[in-house]
Design a protein with these regions (language model features):
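Signature of N-terminal electron-transfer/Fe-S-associated modules in redox systems
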Residues: 1-161
Length: 161
């Protein structure tokens, strides 16, 4: 077992994990943060995207021991303290950017990272290119793209830019 310490959604966490434990397993099984989904186990679907030190990472590709000393944010920790939803989450709700919802946490975490890297004025082409690592089996992506564009603009108006 390996002892790791990290910050998850602003809270210090210490855990003893098998060195082969994936970050997604630590989050879901040990910390009960089940918003991070496992869709493929092969790093293709993007349902497991979280932020590590502010950057989007597929949690199924990262060993938990590699997150030792780092800050991890999951969909559960995305909204500001006291706020019911992050502006990107609100945009997905308002623009019907989900159907079954399984891919939604990963889409939203990827979208927030996209805004941080590329800014608030995102073209449809840029959004679609950036979503290549995220799969949705239910939609044609149009409402997801619209949700991300609206969420990016909403983030510009908030202090979560």
């Amino acid at each position: 077992m390996a002892k790791i310490s990290l910050i998850v959604n602003g809270n210090p966490v210490t855990a003893n994990v098998d060195p082969r434990t994936l970050l997604v397993q630590l989050l879901r099984e040990n910390l009960h943060l089940t918003g991070t989904h496992v869709g493929c186990d092969t790093s293709q679907c993007g349902a497991c995207v979280v932020h590590v030190d502010g950057k989007a990472v597929k949690a199924c590709t990262l060993l938990a021991v590699m997150a030792d000393g780092h800050e991890v944010k999951t969909i559960e920790g995305l909204a500001a303290d006291g706020a019911p939803l992050h502006p990107m989450q609100e945009a997905f709700r308002e623009h019907h950017g989900l159907q079954c919802g399984f891919c939604t946490p990963g889409m939203i975490m990827t979208a927030v990272d996209l805004v941080h890297r590329k800014g608030h004025d995102l073209s449809e082409q840029v959004i679609r290119e950036e979503l290549e690592g995220n799969l949705c089996r239910c939609t044609g992506y149009q409402n997801i793209v619209q949700s991300i564009a609206a969420g990016a603009k909403a983030m510009a108006k908030s202090d979560l830019a």
